[in-house]
């Protein structure tokens, strides 16, 4: 009977412990916001390159014509 109160206290402590996700993260667990941010960054970069290459002065891929 001496162990019974200790057992009850331990059960209460275990039940009130903060829960956590026991699943380990894999490479496929990418937040959706991260994918959206990457897409926005890619589109913004491509648009900047396209605008820059029309002038031809700052794009390394476009040949410099007449300058």
From Swiss-Prot:
Protein name per the record: Epsilon-conotoxin TxVA
Signal among keywords: yes
Residues recorded as bearing 4-carboxyglutamate in the entry: 51, 54
Signal peptide: 1-19
Family the entry assigns: Belongs to the conotoxin T superfamily.
Origin organism lineage: Eukaryota, Metazoa, Spiralia, Lophotrochozoa, Mollusca
Record keywords: Bromination, Calcium channel impairing toxin, Disulfide bond, Gamma-carboxyglutamic acid, Glycoprotein, Hydroxylation, Ion channel impairing toxin, Neurotoxin, Presynaptic neurotoxin, Secreted, Signal, Toxin
Tissue expression summary: Expressed by the venom duct.
GO molecular function annotation: calcium channel regulator activity; toxin activity
Compartments in which it is found: Secreted
UniProt free text on domains: The cysteine framework is V (CC-CC).
Glycosylation sites: 60
UniProt organism field: Conus textile (Cloth-of-gold cone)
PTM remark: O-glycan consists of the disaccharide Gal-GalNAc.
Annotated function: Epsilon-conotoxins act at presynaptic membranes, blocking the calcium channels or G protein-coupled receptors. Causes hyperactivity upon intracranial injection into mice. Causes dorsal fins drooping in fish.
Major subcellular site: secreted
GO CC terms, sorted: extracellular region; host cell presynaptic membrane
């Amino acid at each position: 009977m001496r162990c019974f109160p200790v057992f009850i206290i331990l059960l209460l402590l275990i039940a009130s412990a903060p829960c956590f996700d026991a699943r380990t993260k894999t490479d496929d667990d990418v937040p959706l916001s991260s994918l959206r941010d990457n897409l926005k960054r890619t589109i913004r970069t491509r648009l900047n390159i396209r605008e820059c290459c029309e002038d031809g002065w700052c794009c390394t891929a476009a040949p410099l014509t007449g300058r």
